[in-house]
Amino acid sequence: MGRNRILLNATASLLATMALASCGGGSDGGGTVAPPAPPMSTAPTIVVSRVFAALTFSQPTVLKQAPGDSSRWFVGEKNGLIRVFANNPSASSSSTFLDITGVVDASGEGGLLGFAFHPDFPITPEVYVSYTRSGAPLVSYLSRFLSNDNGLTLLPGSEDPILTVLQPQTNHNGGDILFGPDGYLYAGFGDGGGSGDPLGNGQDDENLHGAIISH
């Protein structure tokens, strides 16, 4: 008798649970559970708008402003030019900030690939430029250039090479450079190129390819 009572109690509890689940809280008594509302999207809204529509550049590789100066933009072109123009939506002309087209090898994935203003520019009138230089073999140059007109232009003849790195291939030639908040200059030169990373440069901590250096 006791066993039958336990079975009856268990059956009653199960039926009650099923009945509650079928109710679902719907107001129409139909027993249908509404699906949960989808989570609100947290993705940012991105709008692409054309700016400086009156300006055109040849294979631009870098776009940046000098420290503390929002009045101008500087554009590096693959062929070895750095051009400057006013930060005005209606700007229609640009001028040459630096021209080293005569020494830059812009073939393959090389060219003028990066530049960085000294953090105190133009008080300290130095700009660092990273590019691949014409000649054989192909070599990446990290050089310092000076301004003698309060930062309006750079002197091509003032070039002071800081570091040179041999490039065994004409692809994967890196060259982005920037100053960190610690005041050091950081630079990379790519992984040395070649299909399938044949030299394993990225895993070699004694090789400047596939690395970031500080100066």
Residue ranges and their predicted role:
Residues 1-12:
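Bacterial N-terminal signal peptides that target proteins for export
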Residues 20-22:
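C-terminal motif of bacterial Sec signal peptides marking the signal peptidase cleavage site
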Residues 141-150, 201-215:
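Beta-propeller blade signature
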Residues 25, 29-30, 35-196:
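Acidic, Gly/Ser/Thr-rich repeat motifs that build Ca2+-stabilized beta-propeller blades
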